[in-house]
Amino acid sequence: MKKIFTLFIIMFSFFTKGNAQYDQLATEFSFNDTEGKEISLADYKKKVILVVNVASRCGFTNQYEGLQALSKKYKDKGLVVVGVPSNNFRQEPGTNKEIKDFCETSFGIDFPITEKLSVIGSDAHPFFVWAKKNYGSGAVPKWNFHKIIIGRNGKVVNTFSSITKPSSNRFISTIEKEHKN
């Protein structure tokens, strides 16, 4: 009987450990900014968080302008935009300092920009690994300027591909709906 009970406990612990990530919230992750300072999503609990993988040499780079406008318009209502530079698609070759300078001088970006990191593959940042495991392939960036909206509850509400502009009606209505929740 002891052996069966022990076996049951071992099997149960494997099962719960394998599913523990599903209980994790986006607000349990953190990034470093371009200067190495921590950007903890826990600081944005009860806010709507928009995580976007970005790049300075992409055909969608002009979306920085729309992201900044969105940040400015909804910041006081509790929206936080977090830009995540990535060279996974070979369009962000710059250093962290170059990325920061580009964002500030070209688009007046004042929302948090992380250090350059991987958003796909075996070396993807844990946030993106979590998003994929919990929300499927739709949460995985297929290109730069993939957008992940996190609700006030810390869970992914929706994802939008690169072709969806930050000014699109569907995108804006998702943001506004989350602000009402």
Give names to the regions the model predicted:
Residues 47-48, 57, 61-84, 104-107:
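Conserved helix-turn-beta segment immediately C-terminal to the redox Cys motif
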Residues 30, 97-144:
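Short, internal strand/loop/helix patches
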Residues 126-129, 133-181:
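Thiol-/selenol-based redox modules, centered on thioredoxin-like
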Residues 57-58, 85-90, 117-119, 162:
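Short histidine/acidic/glycine/proline-rich micro-motifs that form metal-
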Residues 19-42:
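N-terminal "domain-start" segment that seeds a small globular fold
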Residues 1-23:
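Bacterial Sec-dependent N-terminal signal peptides
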Residues 33, 53-57:
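Amphipathic alpha-helical repeat scaffolds
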